[in-house]
Design a protein with these regions (language model features):
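Metallo-beta-lactamase
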Residues: 40-41, 135, 142-143, 148-217, ...
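Accessory terminal helices/loops
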Residues: 96, 194-199, 207-270
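Conserved beta-strand hairpin/beta-sheet module of binuclear metal-dependent hydrolase folds
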Residues: 3-54, 150-162
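Short Pro/Gly-enriched beta-strand edge/turn motifs at strand-loop
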Residues: 4-13, 108-111, 130-135
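Active-site HxH/HxHxD metal-binding segment of metal-dependent hydrolases
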Residues: 53-128
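Active-site neighborhood of phospho(di)ester-bond hydrolases with catalytic His/Asp-centered motifs
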Residues: 36-38, 60-68, 88-91, 159-162, ...
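Divalent metal-coordination and catalytic microenvironments
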Residues: 27, 37, 52, 66, ...
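Short acidic-hydrophobic surface loop/beta-edge motif
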Residues: 27, 126-131
Length: 270
């Protein structure tokens, strides 16, 4: 156990472009810094770079917690600014990024110069991260959802939930198309709750929402509601309408639209 105290600063960044729904977290100790997730746009990569520089700390590690573009498209800018920093991700996330990168560039071509120009080399992480002697346990990744992890810092009771947690957003379910996938997700949420965290950072949130365990409850409630409405809705459009009716103030409508179509077999997502 380290004698230093860690500070956690959460940023609300673009996803989709123009909507601040994606988080990144800068963790700083006495001398060093850890960044969790690397933004969706080059512009936000520059914003994170400025925050790291202003912190006065040495960036040692960037952890890319998931393989979707809003977790890593901004990494190139950060890597150029901090060439000594290591960029880490789990092996399955690295594999997913390598296979999907070109397709994602095409899908988000409207970003233009805000798109990355290259992939940053990611080193495989299979165990825990450390910052000045503080361990960040890599948890999750069960058989049913092997590419989904979160970080747990026990001394500060801090949980960085990544793609598993949403706060006042429509939950992105397009990548968990089966009931078994979503049941495995709920099991992970129950595992998080059992840790009794104080600080909880969801991967996606509306700015201004609380960084506490209510994000776990909100995500779990939404997944339960999704199953209820899925059973009743005749098609994807009806399912989206039902979700919007239940959650009128949630952001990321696109998640309810695409997730409903995928769950109803009207489209595939990969």
């Amino acid at each position: 156990m380290s004698s230093s105290t860690l500070s956690f600063k959460v940023f609300d960044l673009d996803f989709p472009a123009g909507s601040r729904n994606k988080t990144a977290t800068l963790v700083t100790g006495e001398r060093e810094a850890l960044l969790v997730d690397a933004a969706f746009t080059r512009a936000d990569g520059h914003r994170l770079t400025a925050e790291i520089l202003d912190s006065g700390k040495t960036l040692t590690t960037v952890f890319v917690s998931h393989g979707d573009p809003d977790f890593y498209f901004g990494a190139e800018v950060i890597a150029d600014a901090f060439p000594q920093a290591r960029f880490l991700a789990t092996p399955l996330v690295i594999e997913h990024i390598k296979h999907s990168y070109d397709g994602k560039l095409n899908a988000w071509a409207a970003l233009g110069p805000n798109l990355p120009t290259r992939l940053v080399e990611l080193e495989p992480l299979s165990g825990d991260l450390t910052l000045e002697g503080h361990a960040f346990q890599l948890k999750g990744g069960p058989a049913g959802l092997p590419d989904r992890h979160y970080l747990w810092q026990a001394e500060h009771r801090a949980l960085l939930g990544g793609v598993l947690l949403f706060q006042q957003e429509h939950v992105w379910v397009a990548d968990t198309p089966t009931p078994a996938d979503r049941t495995a997700w709920i099991d992970l949420l129950d595992e998080m709750t059992a840790l009794h965290p104080d600080l909880v950072v969801p991967g996606h949130r509306l700015p201004g929402t609380a960084a506490d365990a209510s994000a776990i409850t909100a995500t779990r409630d939404y997944l339960t509601a999704f199953e209820e409405e899925l059973a009743k809705a005749p098609d994807g459009a009806a399912l989206t309408d039902a979700l919007v009716q239940r959650y009128p103030d949630n952001g990321m409508l696109i998640a309810a639209q695409i997730g409903a179509k995928v769950a109803k077999g009207e489209m595939t997502w990969g």
